[in-house]
């Protein structure tokens, strides 16, 4: 991870222009829109839904909570969209690094370094520094983002032909699908649905295998595997590949911005159709196991959103509305870690409790939640104004 701090108007303007040439504003805007949901907006909508005390409010609040197994809520799309956008940014980053003279070996080690940093940040996020290693979540969100992105990034780096990249990504997805289908059928009693609840799903089976193996080597209690879901990390590879293909569409030379938006929309529809076909074959959309249908459906929605953002920003030239999202998107890792390391809810109550007391009690909590979300955005805005971007 490195910290960029730009000072001086002339230098800042030059670096800003260079950065815009290397970045796609629609990707930054969509990344900010994605992270917004876990940067306080989810808590605000949950409190507002409870305060409404009606069916609409209950439905709105439910969308901010993860489904227990099969199904899909808005909040369930945040993680795969983040992985998708990491993949979408890579074609531009790769071209930029090669233009600066980096050899493929150097770029590969930068990929490895980024994965290791994300893995380490994930450990810190999940209280690794308490030194309670047996209960630490090793397969964290950041670790899975880094792993999925690293595999897709290295594939594009070393494969000279795009056709080879496509075949590798299709092979990985097919193998993942077959493993999710066949391993439960081989291990569980006959007649068990392989996509059924987590007790018989492939993620739990693989976790149990790992836990038993580690226990034999290191002794009982070496690691609590209930929440690791190691197998699902492999699914993140496919999500990153989908984002990478979207990025390649945006980077395609000779296509107009309008055509790129149209191709993204067509890609999204194809993925959505694939998700429908998968569901018709008996594979439900299951976020906790990151199963094939979930990969296709979440990828379809992320691609369609990118098509919409690209059409509005890069085709129609309507950029101003995206500024609040770009402020977050330029420091996405920072805002993700912020809520873990800073108690913004307590800070929100400190600054806004007096204002909240003018409202009935259910709405008072909504006001403080809105204040906490506003503080998070203001912190990102301060970093944006100071040209401080913490990137990995």
Task: Name each region found by the language model.
Residues 1-392:
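Alpha-helical transmembrane segments and their immediate juxtamembrane cytosolic regions
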């Amino acid at each position: 991870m490195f910290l960029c701090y730009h000072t001086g108007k002339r230098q800042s303007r030059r670096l800003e222009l260079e950065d815009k040439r290397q970045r796609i504003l629609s990707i930054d805007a969509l990344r900010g829109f994605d992270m917004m949901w876990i940067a306080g907006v989810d808590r605000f909508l949950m409190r507002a839904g409870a305060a409404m005390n009606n069916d609409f409010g209950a439905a709105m609040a439910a969308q901010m909570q993860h489904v227990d197994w099969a199904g899909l809520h808005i909040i369930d799309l945040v993680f795969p969209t983040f992985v998708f956008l990491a993949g979408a940014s890579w074609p531009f980053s790769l071209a930029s690094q090669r233009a600066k003279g980096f050899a493929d070996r150097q770029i590969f080690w930068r990929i490895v370094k980024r994965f290791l940093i994300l893995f380490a940040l994930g450990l810190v996020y999940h209280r690794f520094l308490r030194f309670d290693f047996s209960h630490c979540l090793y397969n964290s969100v950041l670790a899975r983002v880094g792993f999925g992105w690293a595999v897709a990034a290295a594939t594009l780096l070393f494969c000279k032909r795009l056709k080879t990249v496509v075949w590798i990504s299709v092979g990985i997805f097919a193998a993942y699908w077959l493993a999710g289908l066949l391993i439960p059928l081989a291990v569980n009693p006959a007649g068990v649905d392989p996509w059924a609840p987590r007790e018989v799903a492939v993620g739990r089976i693989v976790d149990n295998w790992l836990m038993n193996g580690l226990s034999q080597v290191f002794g009982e209690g070496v690691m609590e595997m209930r929440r690791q879901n190691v197998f699902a990390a492999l699914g993140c590879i496919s999500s990153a590949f989908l984002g990478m293909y979207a990025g390649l569409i945006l980077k395609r030379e000779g296509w107009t911005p309008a055509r790129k938006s149209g191709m993204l929309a067509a890609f999204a529809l194809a993925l959505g159709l694939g998700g429908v076909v998968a569901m018709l074959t008996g594979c439900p959309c299951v976020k906790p196991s990151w199963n094939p249908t979930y990969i296709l459906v979440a990828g379809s929605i992320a691609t369609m959103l990118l098509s919409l953002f690209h059409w509005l920003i890069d085709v129609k030239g309507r950029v101003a509305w995206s500024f609040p999202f770009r402020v977050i998107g330029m420091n996405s890792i920072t805002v993700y870690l912020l809520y873990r390391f800073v108690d913004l809810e307590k800070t929100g109550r400190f600054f806004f409790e007096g204002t909240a007391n003018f409202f009935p009690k259910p709405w008072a909590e909504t006001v403080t939640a809105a204040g906490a979300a506003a503080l998070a955005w203001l912190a990102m805005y301060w970093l944006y104004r100071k040209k401080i971007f913490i990137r990995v």
